[in-house]
Amino acid sequence: MGRISSANAWHDLLTSPGQADFVDAYLAVAALSREFARQREGDVSWEVEGQVGYNFGDQSHWEFNGAFGPRWHAFPWNGSVKTSAAFLFGLSMATEVPEVELELEGDSEKLLIYWCMEVAVGPPRGEWSVSLRLHHRSGGFGLFADDGGMNALALGARFGF
């Protein structure tokens, strides 16, 4: 579950999270990811993820995202708290041009670039973890749109099976 920020830039959420303003727009996402490769003696995995999201509050539409990228697993405290960090990159398709993106950016498109950064923590031998994710849609510096996009901070749960 995430809440959409009114911050213009994703890095504003990372550098000053306590000063972030949020709009009354939320995002609920269900995702399936699959690891397809491991490197560096298992320290890095590569995964692909598909997401179905529903935006509600000040906007109401569905969002479909597909992304792939690396996940880092080698943290020195993993014996106490299993930790991983991921960066995934792909595409995001909204079922309509998001109203909040229009309000915040002046324009947007249904199809935009999608990326996320995630940190997940859980018990050392457990198959579940809690995740904190920055969910980002953007025009990709004019590749898909000159304006548009959004940032959402999301808290979630991951289950391995």
Region spans (language model):
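Short glycine/proline- and aromatic-enriched beta-strand/turn motifs that initiate or cap beta-hairpins
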Residues: 1-34, 158
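Outer-membrane beta-barrel transmembrane domain signature
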Residues: 27, 34-41, 46-148, 158-161
